[in-house]
Regions:
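Charged DNA-binding/catalytic regions of mobile-element recombinases
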Residues: 1-284
Length: 284
């Protein structure tokens, strides 16, 4: 019917569909498929495959990059259009809401990153932070260490307390995983855990220089805040882990099995942290 109306009047498909309150996508789906619509169907299947493989974590830009890596060449706007038409909406982290630590670090270290460019190589600057993880009817606490060059999570620790041992465990894991040189910078907020004697002794023992954000200014440590937001949006979706074992297993799978090795990072020109580090190693 729509075709006959457009053929007998000066109105286009858009206007006729608006008057009849029929979605244009329904009309095009019912109409005899064109070469373009056939190509759209094939592209949509590829988009679906990537979207499902990444559990709804990828928006159109990352999917477009993933398609290109598979030699499927198209415009990003086309991917966006097809995703909108099929209701594929990526998980979104909550808007960054500044949160302060207890700010109780004794003799806080200066901010060595202020007005400095991001590092050009791995193991030049690490950053750390702590966040709350909902588990059953209680909270656990996750401490991470991230390499600011590659955005790779190089160490993490999960515990039911906020003592300094939490951040020490995360740093110990990072030190075991990486080969560092003297003068590596470790940056954090002014939390008492990072200002504790035991943590500072650990840094000193490995010739690591400590850097801290200005008090009540978490924007100075936005890299770790960004990761925490991504983790909660893409794993929890406002839910809770069943228990501590479930939380530990899922966080391990997310960090070591996905975030570091499979997830494309926009800040790395849409490559993964592991591939980014490999490219730097080859270049040097």
């Amino acid at each position: 019917m729509i075709t006959s109306i457009t053929q007998s009047t000066a109105h286009g498909v858009r206007r006729v569909c608006e008057v009849l309150q029929v979605p244009r996508s329904s009309y095009y789906h019912a109409a005899e498929p064109t070469q373009r619509s056939v190509e759209d169907d094939d592209l949509t299947q590829s988009i679906y495959t990537i979207f499902r493989a990444h559990r709804g974590r990828y928006g159109y830009r990352r999917i477009w990059k993933q398609l290109a890596a598979q030699d499927i060449i198209c415009a990003p706007a086309r991917v966006r259009r097809l995703m909108l038409e099929h209701g594929l909406v990526a998980l979104q982290p909550k808007t960054f809401a500044p949160k302060t630590s207890d700010g109780r670090a004794d003799a806080p270290s200066p901010n060595l990153l202020l007005n400095q460019p991001l590092p050009a190589k791995p193991n030049e600057v690490w950053a750390g932070d702590i966040t709350y993880i909902p588990v059953g009817e209680r909270w656990l606490y996750l401490a991470v260490v991230i390499d600011l060059c590659s955005r790779r999570i190089v160490g993490w620790s999960l515990a039911d307390h906020l003592r300094s041992e939490l951040v020490v465990a995360a740093m110990d894991q990072a030190l075991q995983a990486r080969h560092i040189t003297p003068n590596l910078i470790f940056h954090s907020d002014r939390g008492s855990q990072y200002g504790s004697t035991v943590f500072r002794q650990l840094l000193k023992g490995h010739s690591i220089r400590q850097s801290m954000s200005a008090r009540a200014n978490p924007y100075h440590n936005a890299w770790t805040e960004s990761f925490m937001g991504t983790l909660k949006a893409e794993m929890l979706q406002n839910g809770r882990f069943i228990n501590a074992s479930d939380a530990s297993a899922e966080i391990f799978a997310f960090i070591d099995g996905y975030y570091n090795t499979q997830r494309l990072h926009s800040s790395l020109n849409y490559t993964t942290p592991s591939n980014f580090e490999s490219a730097i190693a080859l270049a040097n």
